[in-house]
Swiss-Prot record:
Residue list for modification N-acetylthreonine: 2
Protein name: Ferritin heavy chain
Binding sites annotated in the UniProt record for Fe cation 1: 28, 63, 66
Catalytic activity: 4 Fe(2+) + O2 + 4 H(+) = 4 Fe(3+) + 2 H2O
Localization annotation: Cytoplasm; Lysosome; Cytoplasmic vesicle, Autophagosome
Pfam families the record matches: Ferritin
Family statement drawn from the similarity comment of this UniProt entry: Belongs to the ferritin family.
BP term (GO), one: intracellular iron ion homeostasis
Subunit-structure text: Oligomer of 24 subunits. There are two types of subunits: L (light) chain and H (heavy) chain. The major chain can be light or heavy, depending on the species and tissue type. The functional molecule forms a roughly spherical shell with a diameter of 12 nm and contains a central cavity into which the insoluble mineral iron core is deposited. Interacts with NCOA4; NCOA4 promotes targeting of the iron-binding ferritin complex to autolysosomes following starvation or iron depletion.
Span of the signal peptide: none
One GO CC annotation: lysosome
Alphabetized GO MF terms: ferric iron binding; ferrous iron binding; ferroxidase activity
General function of this protein: Stores iron in a soluble, non-toxic, readily available form. Important for iron homeostasis. Has ferroxidase activity. Iron is taken up in the ferrous form and deposited as ferric hydroxides after oxidation. Also plays a role in delivery of iron to cells. Mediates iron uptake in capsule cells of the developing kidney. Delivery to lysosomes is mediated by the cargo receptor NCOA4 for autophagic degradation and release of iron.
C-alpha cells in the first residue's frame, strides 16, 4: 500500500478529526447497508409491504449520500479517505415493520451519537469549519429522522403491531403510502 501524500490544501484540520471522519463514513455506509437489507426484506413476496420497502430504500440512499458528502469534505479539507470493511447487518429477517422501525430508530440514535462526538472533537480541536459543516448538513436532520422513526414506532404499537398483520398493512398503505405525496 502506498502512503498518502501530504495535502497542500490542509489547514487547521487535525489528524483526530480526519480519522473520526473516516469512521463516520464507515458508519453512514453501514447504515445504508442496513436500510438496503430492510428494503429488500419488505419487498419479498412473502412480506409484500411495498411502501416499507420504498421507505427503507430511500433511507439507504440518504445514508449513502451522507457518506459521500463526508468523503467530499475529507478531500476538501486535505484529509485522506481510508475506507474500512462494512459490517453485515445484525439481521437478515426483520420480522415485522415494527421491529424494523425500532431497529432503524436505534441505528439513527447511534449515528446521531457518533455525529455529536465528532462535533465535540471539532470543538475541542478548534475547527469551526467542521462544526459548521456538521450543524448545517447533519445534526438537525438526525433529530428530524429520530422523531419521524419514533412517531412510526408509536403509531405501529398503537395499531397493535406486530400481533396484528392488518396494522402493518394499513400503516404501509396509509402512512408510508402518503409519504409519496409529501416528498
Amino acid at each position: 500500500m502506498t502512503t498518502a501524500s501530504t495535502s497542500q490544501v490542509r489547514q487547521n484540520y487535525h489528524q483526530d478529526s480526519e480519522a473520526a471522519i473516516n469512521r463516520q463514513i464507515n458508519l453512514e455506509l453501514y447504515a445504508s447497508y442496513v436500510y438496503l437489507s430492510m428494503s429488500y426484506y419488505f419487498d419479498r413476496d412473502d412480506v409484500a409491504l411495498k411502501n416499507f420497502a420504498k421507505y427503507f430504500l430511500h433511507q439507504s440512499h440518504e445514508e449513502r449520500e451522507h457518506a459521500e458528502k463526508l468523503m467530499k469534505l475529507q478531500n476538501q479539507r486535505g484529509g485522506r479517505i481510508f475506507l474500512q470493511d462494512i459490517k453485515k447487518p445484525d439481521c437478515d429477517d426483520w420480522e415485522s415493520g415494527l421491529n424494523a422501525m425500532e431497529c432503524a430508530l436505534h441505528l439513527e440514535k447511534n449515528v446521531n451519537q457518533s455525529l455529536l462526538e465528532l462535533h465535540k472533537l471539532a470543538t475541542d480541536k478548534n475547527d469551526p469549519h467542521l462544526c459548521d459543516f456538521l450543524e448545517t448538513h447533519y445534526l438537525n436532520e438526525q433529530v428530524k429522522a429520530i422523531k419521524e422513526l419514533g412517531d412510526h414506532v408509536t403509531n405501529l404499537r398503537k395499531m397493535g403491531a406486530p400481533e396484528s398483520g392488518l396494522a402493518e398493512y394499513l400503516f404501509d398503505k396509509h402512512t408510508l403510502g402518503d409519504s409519496d405525496n409529501e416528498s
